[in-house]
């Protein structure tokens, strides 16, 4: 397959390069990624500034470009200008940290994959759980991403599909299997610490703790039980459950 590879951690991040090295052994890979760290960019795009594109050399045989924009910008620029007619699938990742539960709304990694689907290209986001002071398990995540890709044939790929793949932090032997499941609830209970700087301004720092309320059958539940999770996503935000009710409420 011809694969467009992107991320939100930046073009020099270990995750994307681990995945690129493995995928390039079996597929044609073009890497288009942010020049700097752009985590939690969500689906933001660059409007008021020019986007700078630079070709980057990689030690494996792929074309690579850095973009002075967001993850969504990378996909837009790639599919409009750099490789407009030659991509079978967009893969975003490997992200440093999970993208499960409500966190997918903030994720530049997932949003880049969704942008691919908006261009009618099947897409997959890949994320690996990160635990502070421990070595990331990118090689395991890359192996699972390749395994998912190898199960697909071009004719199997629907152009509006977005697959969200997450790999828990554990040894490959400890992984219990793969679960196709729904998105869970929030992972963290958010709060801000507050300080006062020398000029009397409030300085807020994001903190929080792990949300212990877990719904069974969700990606959050299965990741915590050492399963790889795969969730099909879509970008239609319409709440169909109350569409008719809303019409009756406001138009009747």
Curated annotation (Swiss-Prot):
Keywords: Cytoplasm, Hydrolase, Metal-binding, Nucleotide-binding. A divalent metal cation binds at residues 8-9, 39, 95. Pfam families: SurE. GO terms for cellular component: cytoplasm. Gene3D superfamilies: Survival protein SurE-like phosphatase/nucleotidase. It comes from the Bacteria. It catalyses: a ribonucleoside 5'-phosphate + H2O = a ribonucleoside + phosphate. Binds 1 divalent metal cation per subunit. InterPro entries: SurE, SurE-like_Pase/nucleotidase, SurE-like_sf. It is found in: Cytoplasm. Its cofactor is a divalent metal cation. GO terms for molecular function: 3'-nucleotidase activity; 5'-nucleotidase activity; exopolyphosphatase activity; metal ion binding; nucleotide binding. Its EC number is 3.1.3.5. The keyword Metal-binding applies. Nucleotidase that shows phosphatase activity on nucleoside 5'-monophosphates. PANTHER family: 5'-NUCLEOTIDASE SURE (PTHR30457), 5'_3'-NUCLEOTIDASE SURE (PTHR30457:SF12). HAMAP family: SurE. Belongs to the SurE nucleotidase family. This is 5'-nucleotidase SurE. It comes from Clostridium botulinum (strain Langeland / NCTC 10281 / Type F). The gene is surE.
